[in-house]
Amino acid sequence: MHHIKIMLSRLWQCADRTRDRLLFPGCDFAAWVTQEAAGFTPEQGNQYQPSTNALPQVLRRFPITSGDRILDVGCGKGKAMALMRRFPFGQVAGFDISPAMADVANRNFRQLKLRDCHAFQADAATFTGYDDYNYLYFYNSLPKPVFREAIGHLEESLARRPRCCRLIYLNPVYHDFLVRDTAFREIFRRRSWSSWFTYVCYEYRPG
């Protein structure tokens, strides 16, 4: 069964790369990048893989307005952010531990002429600038210790500036930690044939 999943995953990757070339001409979203090639260690982050094209179907479940701001934690080349920009977020931002990956993302945004869409370099283990955001996006970009640190910083922000916050998580390998050890609660999920491509959405409400 595991070998079948790997084969199906490779077929999906090939199909998704083809779709990305059609959807985002002139952009570099599709190719996977290892930690070594991106300039960081496996202890700092996971390899880059582009988010799936199903993200807009997930975002349509939310009443997004210009008052909402979303942050992609571990944005890589920025594909998820380009998809987010189809919605009326007041701001779409993202960061990656690799400055080279953030540079690729910003080149992609310029190619697509996307406004209010910017990637910057930061380490999720130490980043604390969550106060301005009420939507967060993760695509299993972080090892568990770093993910715990990031969620801890997010919870500090929510205590400091109480607000409703939604977290969108693709390939939610640390789902149990979120629902057991944090104040976030699952509100819905979009299932796929593999957990690798399953989205789970969570919500935090103050009080």
Can you annotate each of these PLM segments?
Residues 78-82:
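Glycine-rich SAM-binding Motif I of class I
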Residues 68-74:
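Conserved class I S-adenosyl-L-methionine
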Residues 114-124:
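Conserved SAM-binding strand-loop segment of SAM-dependent methyltransferases
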Residues 86-91:
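Conserved S-adenosyl-L-methionine
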